[in-house]
Curated annotation (Swiss-Prot):
InterPro entries: T4SS_VirB10/PtlG, T4SS_VirB10/TraB/TrbI, T4SS_VirB10/TrbI. Interacts with virB4, virB8 and virB9. This is Type IV secretion system protein virB10. NCBIfam families: T4SS_VirB10. It comes from Bartonella quintana (strain Toulouse). Belongs to the TrbI/VirB10 family. The keyword Cell membrane applies. The keyword DNA damage does not apply. The gene is virB10.
Length: 385
């Protein structure tokens, strides 16, 4: 028993000694690594100190600009003539010739220098001549006088506004003219529907007289043809109609190019307006019903149902939304039945002088007799007082 205990103690001591030896070995390795690191750092510091020493600074060499061509004296300026006196304005101007000195050599050297130059500048000869003439005409005192900005503004304020006058004129012959602004009552011959653009026509319900009320220019029964465009906007309840041409029973035609109005002169034609509420509300109800049906079907399906059936159910609301978008943008429709009354607002003076001619149907004696009795109507028993 004692021998076993002694062997155990000896084994424990040997393990303790082995652990202490390992610790000493690790400490020595750490010390060696630290010394190596310090040596590397010292070497780097020493190398940086050597490189940071002041190096001799080389000054840039000064560029010396030398003259490659000979010096040329400036050409003499042309002598300007002194302004003549007021009494000698009619005398012709005499230009003195300027002396020319070796112009050929100077021109050749300038031409060679211009060809060697990287950039060439050109000047318009006409502008330069005009500027030279202006400079010769103006005196140095005038060049020194520059207008002040305040003076220019004041002069601009003193200028009045140019107003063009408008002259009054008269109509050539009022017996042949239907003046602008007249109203022509007309009965629709065809019905109107704003779903599609198209043409329409109407019949004049009474005789239309001239501007002075003496001559019938458009007989009763005249046919007027016009056109209208499709597509009313939401909230509108009037349709614009443009009357193009009128044709009398005798075959006289004239271009109107005038708009249609109602009895009170309001632009456009009124009528029965259909806003298509049933289609719009029906599409909204369709969407709600389809959504409820798809939700109910989705809840009724088992969780392990096939994917194709779920895709079919989910595509229902998308189709309903597309239908709603198409029906929600339906424009309102205006309809006006045939036989209803409309008016034509004359937008320009209508001249019938090229197709109608007037002639006297009573002699002077008959006219005088009717004027004495104050009966201005032919074959009438009514006496006007």
């Amino acid at each position: 028993m004692k021998d076993e205990i002694d062997e155990n103690n000896i084994n424990d001591r040997s393990t303790i000694k082995d652990g202490q030896g390992k610790k000493l070995h690790s400490n020595t390795s750490k010390a060696v690594a630290l010394l190596v690191l310090l040596g590397v750092c010292g070497y780097l510091a020493y190398s940086t100190l050597i490189t940071n020493k002041k190096q001799p600074v080389e000054l840039p060499k000064e560029a010396i600009i030398k003259q490659t061509e000979r010096f040329r004296p400036a050409q003499p300026k042309p002598v300007l003539l002194e302004p003549t006196e007021k009494n000698n304005l009619l005398l012709p101007k005499v230009e003195l010739p300027t002396p020319k000195r070796n112009q050929t050599n100077a021109d050749d050297s300038l031409l060679e220098a211009a060809q060697r130059a990287p950039v060439l500048a050109y000047a318009s000869p006409q502008k330069s001549q005009a500027n030279a003439e202006k400079n010769n005409d103006t005196s140095p005192n005038q060049l020194e006088r520059k207008p002040d900005e305040t003076a220019q503004r004041f002069n601009h304020l003193l200028k009045p506004t140019n107003l063009e006058g408008i002259h009054a004129s008269t109509l050539t012959n009022r017996n042949y003219i239907i003046a602008m602004g007249a109203s022509i009552p007309c009965i629709l011959e065809t019905a109107i529907s704003s779903d599609q653009q198209g043409f329409t026509s109407c019949i004049v319900s009474r005789d239309i007289l001239s501007d002075n009320g003496r001559v019938v220019l458009l007989d009763k029964g005249t046919q007027i043809v016009g056109e209208y465009r499709s597509g009313l906007k939401k909230g509108q309840n009037r349709l614009f109609v443009l009357w193009n041409r009128a044709k009398t029973p005798s075959g006289v035609i004239i271009t109107l190019a005038s708009p249609a109005t109602d009895a009170l002169g309001r632009s456009g034609v009124d009528g029965d307006v259909d806003n298509h509420w049933f289609e719009r509300i029906g599409s909204a109800l369709l969407v709600s019903i389809v959504r409820d049906a798809t939700n109910y079907a989705r809840n009724r399906l088992p969780k392990d149902q096939d994917k194709n059936s779920s895709d079919t159910i989910s595509s229902g609301p998308n189709i309903a939304n597309i239908v709603v978008e198409n029906y929600a943008n339906i424009p309102p429709t205006l309809t006006k039945n045939q036989g209803e009354m409309v008016n034509v607002f004359v937008a320009r003076d209508l001249d019938f002088s090229s197709v109608y001619k007037l002639k006297v149907i009573e002699d002077k004696k008959q006219i005088v007799n009717r004027s004495i009795s104050r009966n201005f109507y032919k074959n009438s028993a009514v006496i006007l007082k």
